[in-house]
From Swiss-Prot:
Part of the core SMN complex that contains SMN1, GEMIN2/SIP1, DDX20/GEMIN3, GEMIN4, GEMIN5, GEMIN6, GEMIN7, GEMIN8 and STRAP/UNRIP. Part of the SMN-Sm complex that contains SMN1, GEMIN2/SIP1, DDX20/GEMIN3, GEMIN4, GEMIN5, GEMIN6, GEMIN7, GEMIN8, STRAP/UNRIP and the Sm proteins SNRPB, SNRPD1, SNRPD2, SNRPD3, SNRPE, SNRPF and SNRPG. Interacts with GEMIN6; the interaction is direct. Interacts with STRAP/UNRIP; the interaction is direct. Interacts with GEMIN8; the interaction is direct. Interacts with SNRPB, SNRPD2, SNRPD3 and SNRPE; the interaction is direct. CDD domains: Gemin7 (cd11677). PANTHER family: GEM-ASSOCIATED PROTEIN 7 (PTHR14679:SF1). It comes from the Eukaryota. The gene is GEMIN7. Residues 1-29 form the SUZ-C domain. One of its GO terms (cellular component) is SMN-Sm protein complex. Gene3D superfamilies: 2.30.30.100. The SMN complex catalyzes the assembly of small nuclear ribonucleoproteins (snRNPs), the building blocks of the spliceosome, and thereby plays an important role in the splicing of cellular pre-mRNAs. Most spliceosomal snRNPs contain a common set of Sm proteins SNRPB, SNRPD1, SNRPD2, SNRPD3, SNRPE, SNRPF and SNRPG that assemble in a heptameric protein ring on the Sm site of the small nuclear RNA to form the core snRNP (Sm core). One of its GO terms (molecular function) is RNA binding. This is Gem-associated protein 7. InterPro entries: Sm (IPR047575), SMN_gemin7 (IPR020338), SUZ-C (IPR024642).
Length: 131
């Protein structure tokens, strides 16, 4: 029996970092990720706090709308759009506590009908339903 030939693996070498010892890129270099320009409010901590509280209220409102939409979907026919433009339809049953998976029944896929299934939320691009 012959021993397998080792296939060489390409190695990516990063340039030296700004301090000369590490590898990587300078944070202010031309390859640094672009960050959106956000005006900083430094003069008044109360204004900064109110901006953070406004963002928090907006997030809370969006989360509440999302959770209410999940509650309204229970027992209804829902159409899901997945990656690669795949469209499936199913009766929505439930979701887990982390809202990471949807439990559905009568899942109609391009290759047939599945009696029960779990859809990962990370695979779902959008969903629609009629209440």
């Amino acid at each position: 029996m012959q021993t397998p030939v080792n296939i060489p693996v390409p190695v990516l070498r990063l340039p030296r970092g700004p301090d000369g010892f590490s590898r990587g890129f300078a944070p202010d270099g031309r390859r640094a990720p672009l960050r959106p320009e956000v005006p900083e409010i430094q003069e008044c901590p109360i204004a900064q706090e109110s901006l953070e509280s406004q963002e928090q209220r907006a997030r809370a409102a969006l989360r509440e709308r999302y959770l209410r939409s999940l509650l309204a979907m229970v027992g209804h026919q829902v159409s899901f759009t997945l990656h690669e433009g795949v469209r499936v339809a199913a009766h929505f049953g439930a979701t887990d506590l982390d809202v990471a998976n949807f439990y559905v029944s009568q899942l109609q896929t391009p290759i047939g009908v599945q009696a029960e299934a779990l859809l990962r939320c990370s695979d779902i691009i959008s969903y629609t339903f009629k209440p």
